[in-house]
Amino acid sequence: MITIALPKGRIAEDTLAIFRKIFGSEFLFEDRKLILEEGNFRFLMVRNQDIPTYVTEGAADVGVVGLDVLEEHHPDVVRLLDLHIGKCRVCVGIKNDEELDYTQPELKIATKMPNIARNYFAQKATALKIIKLYGSIELAPLVGLSDAIVDVVETGSTMKQNGLKIAETIMQSSAHLIANKSSFIIKKDEILELYHKIKEQIPKTQ
């Protein structure tokens, strides 16, 4: 049996849709259930940020996780495949009536992705104060907590609704298939078979 960690929300639905096409089974989680067993697969419903931990520690053989999470945490996993679902961007956001001021001695950036933010602004030789937040990040520049934010953006509508605009795009992100290193050795044939079946479906699901 292969255990697969999925992120809650749309990416999980899109991933299960791929499995339905491949195997012809329903692959539906019962209401509020966090585990789904179907055929040779056990799916776990997990917070996106926790998936690298589940896979790294061996609680899951395989996981589906955003590239932004991989770049933020750099987990020790095997990166198998870009699934081309869950597409989004990591962007710098600022108030509509402002511009990023690189002449400041220090920029205050509110984000839940401090490593991505730090690496990006380091390339611009800009001193940074990171303000780590876990939600409502758009609020930070509006109340003077930060000069700007670094956050995941899908359509940009949330920023617009809160009086912010995209100043710069740091990276493009989409969901990736990853594997535990030990599982990739012990269950290599099963994981590679799954990899090839999913890869065949990707052009049809974009």
From Swiss-Prot:
Highest taxon of the lineage: Bacteria
GO cellular component: a single term: cytoplasm
Gene Ontology BP term (one): L-histidine biosynthetic process
UniProt-listed InterPro entries: ATP_PRibTrfase_cat (IPR013820), ATP_PRibTrfase_CS (IPR018198), ATP_PRibTrfase_HisG (IPR001348), ATP_PRibTrfase_HisG_short (IPR024893)
Keyword Glycoprotein among UniProt keywords: no
Pathway in which this enzyme or protein is active: Amino-acid biosynthesis; L-histidine biosynthesis; L-histidine from 5-phospho-alpha-D-ribose 1-diphosphate: step 1/9
CDD domains the record matches: PBP2_HisGs
Comment, domains: Lacks the C-terminal regulatory region which is replaced by HisZ.
Quaternary structure and partners: Heteromultimer composed of HisG and HisZ subunits.
The name this protein goes by in its record: ATP phosphoribosyltransferase
Species: Campylobacter curvus (strain 525.92)
Lineage: Bacteria, Pseudomonadati, Campylobacterota, Epsilonproteobacteria, Campylobacterales
